[in-house]
Amino acid sequence: MVNDSIFIKKGVELEIEVQSLAYGGMGLAKVDDFVVFVKNGIPGQRVLVLIYKKKKGFAEARIIKVLKQSPLATEARCDHYWICSKLQTLSYEEQLKEKEKQVVDAFQRIGGFTDFTINGVRSAENKYNYRNKMEFTFSPHRWILESEPEGVNSSFALGLHIPGRYD
């Protein structure tokens, strides 16, 4: 049962455990029966999150701090994984299991099918460097990483499109 002092709304911080992945790659956690989608969350993580969006049946949150790392976690190969490939910190084998669960869920919950067989998810021959589409963006304002020195020229940029950013 939710403690009466916890009221889920925009701006509230919560400590929760990510239970699974939702379609699209967000972590899924529940506070009682209330669903909280956690950006960049992976199953098994205990995290402190900030609610940034609240709707009638769910909320969306971003991780402030990982309190306990998931046993399913792995080291990301890319320094910018949190922008372009959020699931790089989830082991590849677990990614395949999650994809299969999502297919089963879609057939059962959305399609209404009960009698079917999934023959597993085929793994890619190469887990990395297989993208066949890239979106580039020109911008008058370069995105500056926190690790870059102050005073870096930010007047022009050509690079990969950052999801959710349109400037």
Indicate where each model-derived feature is located.
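Non-catalytic accessory regions of SAM-dependent methyltransferases
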Residues: 1-167
